[in-house]
């Protein structure tokens, strides 16, 4: 996602992936990120494991913007990235902001991956 004269918008995001349900992220309603996503109608995401053995997966596809974020998604992402206790505290402390967030679903069309534990040198 990019604007004229600028590089692509690349920022870390929390995500939730369930096969058949797409890659789900939540974004602020007035953010540059959601504005660019709406304009492009497509997105890509790359995630990696930096510890050995190095692995990554990249996915590209069309997006669906859902006007209200799903609390289950926010809860699962908070637990995944912050753990049970800190995730619960984050959700409570940010309840008003989270209630305004928008859900974006990336529907995978192309995948690329590397798993160096599977590479035979």
Protein language model regions, located:
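Short, solvent-exposed aromatic-acidic interface loops
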Residues: 28-32, 81
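Generic internal hydrophobic packing segments that stabilize the cores of diverse globular domains
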Residues: 34, 40, 71-75
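Short secondary-structure boundary/capping segments
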Residues: 15, 35, 94-96
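Charged, gly/pro-rich active-site loop segments
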Residues: 55-121
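Short, surface-exposed beta-strand-loop junctions and turns on beta-sheet-rich folds
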Residues: 31-33, 52, 120-121
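Generic marker of residues within folded, mature protein domains
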Residues: 5, 51-53, 96
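Short beta-strand segments
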Residues: 1-29, 37, 43-47, 56-58
């Amino acid at each position: 996602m990019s604007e004229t004269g600028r590089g692509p918008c690349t920022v870390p995001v929390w995500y939730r992936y369930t096969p058949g349900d797409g890659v789900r992220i939540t974004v602020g309603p007035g953010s540059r990120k959601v504005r660019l996503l709406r304009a492009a109608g497509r997105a890509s995401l790359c995630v990696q494991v930096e510890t050995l053995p190095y692995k990554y997966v990249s996915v590209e596809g069309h997006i669906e913007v859902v006007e209200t974020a799903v609390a289950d998604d926010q809860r699962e992402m908070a637990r995944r990235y912050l753990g049970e206790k800190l995730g619960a505290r984050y959700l409570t402390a940010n309840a008003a902001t989270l209630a305004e967030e928008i859900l974006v679903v990336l529907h995978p069309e192309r995948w690329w991956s590397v798993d160096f534990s599977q590479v035979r040198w």
